């Protein structure tokens, strides 16, 4: 927890269904800033639109297929007032997510995509996310 914001690694959320479940589970109690994107595996991302618009405060998009995810959810999510941000790295994604989150929110990295465009595997993506959160904690003077 950093400044009353929790950070959740769901790097195993490599498909739309898993991410929808994570959004519904964690979003029931608080608003989320969700990090989405990666290697999309030709999935239909449109089922993300409704739960993202319901549970998210903001979305940060990473990876090769970020534009595809954005295109699939933009109309519904944009209409609900949830902003969409692009990030070139996991560190940038975590930094943007931290800026968008408010006290009591959570940052959820549940990408709905495979990791192979930017990382060796989902474990490597999780490691890089955790390192980015630790760097953020260090920069804000918080011990994790």
Per-segment meaning from a language model:
Residues 1-144:
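ATP-dependent carboxylate-amine ligase
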């Amino acid at each position: 927890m950093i400044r009353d914001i929790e950070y959740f690694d769901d790097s195993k959320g490599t498909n739309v269904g898993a991410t929808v479940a994570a959004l519904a589970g964690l979003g029931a109690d608080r608003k989320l800033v969700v990090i989405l994107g990666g290697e999309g595996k030709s999935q239909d991302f449109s089922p993300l639109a409704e739960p993202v618009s319901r549970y998210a405060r903001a979305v940060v998009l990473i990876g090769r297929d970020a534009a595809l995810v954005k295109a699939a959810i933009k109309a519904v999510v944009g209409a609900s007032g949830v902003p969409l941000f692009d990030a070139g790295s996991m560190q940038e994604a975590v930094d943007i997510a931290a800026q968008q989150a408010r006290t009591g929110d959570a940052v959820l990295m549940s990408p709905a995509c495979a990791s192979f465009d930017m990382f060796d595997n989902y474990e490597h993506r999780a490691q890089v996310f955790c390192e980015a959160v630790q760097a953020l904690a260090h920069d804000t003077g918080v011990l994790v």
